[in-house]
Design a protein with these regions (language model features):
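Non-cofactor substrate-recognition interfaces
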Residues: 1-4, 10-294
């Protein structure tokens, strides 16, 4: 039995620690054959998205079993690690509920890699799911990708961590690979071969890929270098503005806004959704942050 999850960033799949389903989405079980290996499979996906993967031309080659579940009914089910290179240091590989999961595209099941996405980190923390970290030689937890944009090489990791947590035979082929060609100084950005493609080929051979295709979508790029941006966990300084949120909302009501809708609308809504303020954002063109202690 397989969960059919969808992603536009295959390079984050080795860091997967959860799958998210929607709270109000219905899911069904489909018996079919894998299109790449022709092996029999049973998959779970959103009922609304079945026609996107099982067309009328395919009738007779698949069967919707009739079993169905709402998203929360799948919560807590455990699954096998998709790419077992690194053991997580905590609870992982469970189905969780994510409030941002939709059926606008994909399969209605979202792959969660807490170390490479703010939403992923948020829902994983709420569900008690551990992120997948490595430990470097300094003893610090690090995501699988280093700050140069490549999978950590084994020599930069803590030997004891490597011994106990990494399947070296499986990982060594990909250690040191850049997740985006734009980061690799030795190859051109327009080279056809990418890490994403190589991972897709690997998953095909392992009967773990169901549909692989090119997908055009927006992606953030650095305005100075024109290179793709990675969402990455970094040490930062924060001001705990959430501790004063309720007080600021009260005080906002005493302000005579002109027009009044600014205070109750744009600014008021901003206060209601206030998060802790990150004041030490890391940029390669940044300047030192002055801090005064009183």
């Amino acid at each position: 039995l397989y969960f059919l999850a969808w992603t536009t960033t295959p390079w984050t799949l080795p860091s997967n620690t959860a799958l998210a389903v929607g709270p109000a989405i219905e899911y069904v079980k489909v018996k079919c054959r894998n299109p790449y290996t022709d092996r029999p499979q049973t998959v779970i996906l959103a009922k609304e998205l079945v026609p996107a993967y099982f067309t009328k031309k395919m009738e007779g080659t698949y069967e919707i079993t009739g079993e169905s579940w709402q998203g929360p009914e799948l919560e807590g089910i455990r699954y096998e690690q998709l790419i077992p290179w690194v053991k997580p240091m905590g609870d992982a590989f469970r189905v969780i509920v994510g409030d941002y999961v939709t059926t606008s595209d994909g399969t209605g099941i979202v792959h969660i890699a807490p170390t490479f996405g703010a939403d992923d980190d948020r829902v994983a923390k709420a569900a008690g799911i551990a992120p997948l970290f490595m430990v470097d030689k300094a003893g610090k937890n690090q995501p699988m990708v280093d700050k140069q944009g490549k999978f950590f090489v084994l020599e930069d990791l803590d030997p004891e961590f490597v011994k106990n947590n990494i399947d070296v035979e499986k990982y060594k082929e990909y250690a040191g690979r850049y997740v985006k060609n734009a980061y690799d100084p030795e190859i051109a950005c327009d080279v056809e071969t990418t890490l994403d493609i190589d991972l897709a080929v690997m998953l095909k051979a392992q009967n773990k890929a169901f549909k692989i295709e090119k997908h055009t979508h927006s992606y953030p790029h650095c305005w100075r270098t024109d290179k793709p941006v990675l969402y990455y966990p970094l040490d930062s300084w924060f001001i705990r503005t959430t501790a004063l949120r309720e007080r600021m909302i009260e005080l906002n009501k005493t302000i005579r806004w002109k027009p009044e809708s600014t205070g109750t609308g744009r600014f008021g809504k901003w206060l209601e959704g206030l998060v802790d303020w990150n004041l030490s954002r890391s940029r390669f063109w940044g300047t030192p942050l002055p801090v005064w202690a009183t």
